[in-house]
Amino acid sequence: DTGWSHAYMDECFKREGIDTMLKNGEIEFLFVSHEHLDHFWGLQTVLKYNPEIKIIIPETFYPEGMHLIKGAEFITPGACNRIPHQGKLVQLKIGETNKLYEGCAAVAFDLPIVIRVRGEQSLFFNVKDKGLVCVTGCCHQSILTMADYGQQKIAGGETMYGVYGGLHIAPFGPLNERGEKIVKGMAKYNFKKVACNHCTGLPAVNRMIELGYPVVQGTGSNGSKSNLYVGNGDEVTFG
């Protein structure tokens, strides 16, 4: 994903060395989980350093999203990309398991999401001698839906090892009944590492900790809300 603000993402890229990696072709592709502004509108910053990078999106992208990739400006919402994409664009079909490379698969889930967005794609990694790791953008489909898919249809799914990314459980306030159900439902997968971040929400993280889940702590740096879970600039190793 690309973040939202061009200036902020440029700052982050330089801080973490992503700008150099993009320029040197060390990053094989850009995987955009869904069309929400905080995951997609920072596209120009990526293309600034490598306009030919391969981009992978779900097939549910709206025409406006496709136009943004090609180079467009939308005045009212404030989205723009002045660097047209020149590389390969791959659209993943909903509900299919797509092998990206050995040990890594992508799946696009079909669902309506707030602010006129449809569909979200996520990643599964089969880590040798560990098990399956679920990697998400926001996981609007819910981590339960994603983990069930991994268990049933992805090689290595008999052992669910870890989670990384946003889980969209309590992003804007207290943990509600649905959020409580999701958090409690995670227990059946027996994850060994829960590296949740972004839209998971601190109330959900606190509940996971209360239930004894192995939540990976962060550093609380670079504007992160808390060190109780992974934040900006933090790294997690699953191998």
What kind of feature is each model-predicted range?
Residues 1-16, 120-136:
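Conserved beta-strand hairpin/beta-sheet module of binuclear metal-dependent hydrolase folds
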Residues 71-73, 77-130:
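Active-site-proximal loop/helix segment associated with metal-binding centers of metalloenzymes
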Residues 25-92, 96, 187-193, 209, ...:
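Active-site HxH/HxHxD metal-binding segment of metal-dependent hydrolases
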Residues 1-29, 143-144, 150-153:
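Pre-active-site segment of Zn-dependent metallo-hydrolases
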Residues 175-185:
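Charged helix-capping and loop-helix junction motifs
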Residues 6-7, 35-42, 62-65, 140-144, ...:
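Active-site environment of divalent metal-dependent phosphoester hydrolases
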Residues 185-239:
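Binuclear metal-ion centers of metallo-dependent hydrolases, dominated by the metallo-beta-lactamase
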